[in-house]
Curated annotation (Swiss-Prot):
One of its GO terms (cellular component) is cytoplasm. This is Small ribosomal subunit protein bS16. The keyword Ribonucleoprotein applies. Belongs to the bacterial ribosomal protein bS16 family. One of its GO terms (molecular function) is structural constituent of ribosome.
Length: 89
């Protein structure tokens, strides 16, 4: 199964994350298929950048987002409150 999840990068106690599409059997920071964005939670304000078209594509072909990624996708209006994909505007 393919998952959309966070891949941890950054320094000790200064995490940053890449939002990646990866096989569910791969380790958290291991091999991935594609990077579709990044999230910097330690910056003020927090930085979130997602390629919405690629996220919609992967969701359309059956990739399952993790709980945290679902929240991030809702922030950038890729998913609605029910977790359904919003068509491009």
């Amino acid at each position: 199964m393919v998952k959309i999840r966070l891949r941890r990068t950054g320094k000790t106690k200064q995490p940053s994350y890449r939002i990646v599409v990866a096989d569910s059997r791969s380790p958290r920071d291991g091999k991935f298929i594609e990077t579709i964005g990044y999230y910097l939670p330690t910056r003020q304000p927090k930085v979130l950048e997602i390629k919405a078209d690629r996220a919609r594509y992967w969701l359309g072909v059956g990739a399952q987002p993790t709980e945290v990624v679902v929240k991030l996708l809702k922030r950038v209006n890729v998913l609605d409150e029910q977790g359904k994909v919003i068509a491009e505007a």
